[in-house]
Regions:
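Catalytic strand-loop segment that frames the active site of acyl-thioester-processing enzymes
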Residues: 18-58
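Short Pro/Gly-enriched beta-strand edge/turn motifs at strand-loop
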Residues: 4-10
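Beta-strand-rich interaction surfaces with strong enrichment in secreted/lumenal proteins
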Residues: 11, 54, 96-99
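Compact, glycine-rich, soluble single-domain proteins
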Residues: 50-59, 63-73, 88
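Electropositive phosphate-/nucleotide-binding environments in soluble metabolic enzymes
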Residues: 4, 16-20, 61
């Protein structure tokens, strides 16, 4: 059976708030192992206004932040980390294969 989290439960785990809370739901996770999360991306996201007008794509740095927040949920949902903050220290040789766009 899948473990899922709604936005309120995610907000109990992560310190991020709008507009920088970049995951909307967790479909499944195993504490300390993995997390499958989603961000509902719509055409009116604030970052689309300048990135890029007429051809909006999610900025790569926000894609990395979405991944970091997803990983943080996998770590911070463990009882021993309740109330802690996870920090993503760095990333090397990141490649983006396809752009993320609004539907």
């Amino acid at each position: 059976m899948a473990n899922s989290l709604n936005i309120k439960q995610i907000m109990d785990i992560l310190p991020h708030r709008q507009p920088f809370l970049l995951i909307d739901r967790v479909e499944d996770y195993e504490p300390g192992q993995y997390c499958i999360a989603y961000k509902n991306i719509t055409y009116n996201e604030p970052f689309f206004a300048g990135h890029f007008p007429g051809e909006p794509i999610v900025p790569g740095v926000l894609t990395v932040e979405m991944l970091a927040q997803t990983g943080a949920v996998a770590i911070l949902c463990q009882p021993e980390f309740k109330g802690k903050i996870a920090v993503f220290a760095g990333i090397d040789k990141c490649k983006f294969k396809k752009p993320i766009v609004s539907r």
